[in-house]
Amino acid sequence: MARTRSDSLAAGGLNWDSLPLRLFAGGNAKFWDPADIDFSRDRADWESLTDLERDWATRLCAEFIAGEEAVTQDIQPFMAAMRAEGRLGDEMYLTQFAFEEAKHTQVFRMWLDAVGITEDLQGYLDELPAYCQMFYEELPASLDALATDPSPAAQVRASVTYNHVIEGMMALTGYYAWHRICVDRGILPGMQELVRRIGDDERRHMAWGTFTCRRHVAADDANWAVFETRMNELIPLALRNTEDGFALYDEVPFGLTMEEFQQYAADKGMRRFGTISSARGRPLAEIDVDYSPLHLEDTFADEDRKSLAASA
């Protein structure tokens, strides 16, 4: 694509109050280095777990690291779509987004190495058909589509797939599982720190996805139907992934139940509809500086903290 001008030189400069650049500034302010996390106690805690507990937790970690790797590879077309749309602020934020996904891949791999898990883990995912469909089919297809079709509808479908369902349901449910494993037992402090750091990054990622869907719905109400349709296609698949995981175990460790996690995931998915629908008919200028997408993710985080504290 030939370049004819530089947006950063435009009169008035960049709108630092726009949500994408607010997220970008937030990521800069909260930068963290995986090498600074202390995993030294995690090895002893890991070895104190039963074989069943280690197997369940290894599968959970395998799902996370493979997901982080997938997004690191697949997010590039969204950057190109933002460039095609002339949205420098979004493109700047997505460069940070991609860097953070690569960093998340790094830190999960560092944790696996620290606790001594070096064998091939692909088999843990091969037993999860819904997971494989989501990450090996739905995610790359929806994001790759942006390379040839960067339209608002295609952006909404891609954002729903990753930001709303994969991050907004599946990943949040996985973080909840790690909290239940680690905090309830007072173990794996390195993993606790890892999850806290990643969760903070991904709240910004989800907020950007919500913002992107909101601005497209505000601009054209037809995109609301695109959002609804894609959510209704993928929510059952996300819930089926939880079923697949629990079905592999005659005995589930750590006192976890499928019903608890299904309810948690479904709640996070369904509450996203209201945030997107509230943008219908709104002026685009308002959407650009409306921070409700970030407030929603902060609300979810606060609810989790209170719930986990009450159950401790």
Swiss-Prot record:
It holds the Pfam family Ribonuc_red_sm. Keywords: Iron, Manganese, Metal-binding, Oxidoreductase. GO terms for molecular function: metal ion binding; oxidoreductase activity. It is an enzyme of class 1 (oxidoreductase). There is a cross-link at residues 71-162 (3-(O4'-tyrosyl)-valine (Val-Tyr)). Its EC number is 1.-.-.-. Gene3D superfamilies: Ribonucleotide Reductase, subunit A (1.10.620.20). Probable oxidase that might be involved in lipid metabolism. Belongs to the ribonucleoside diphosphate reductase small chain family. R2-like ligand binding oxidase subfamily. This is R2-like ligand binding oxidase. It comes from Mycolicibacterium vanbaalenii (strain DSM 7251 / JCM 13017 / BCRC 16820 / KCTC 9966 / NRRL B-24157 / PYR-1).
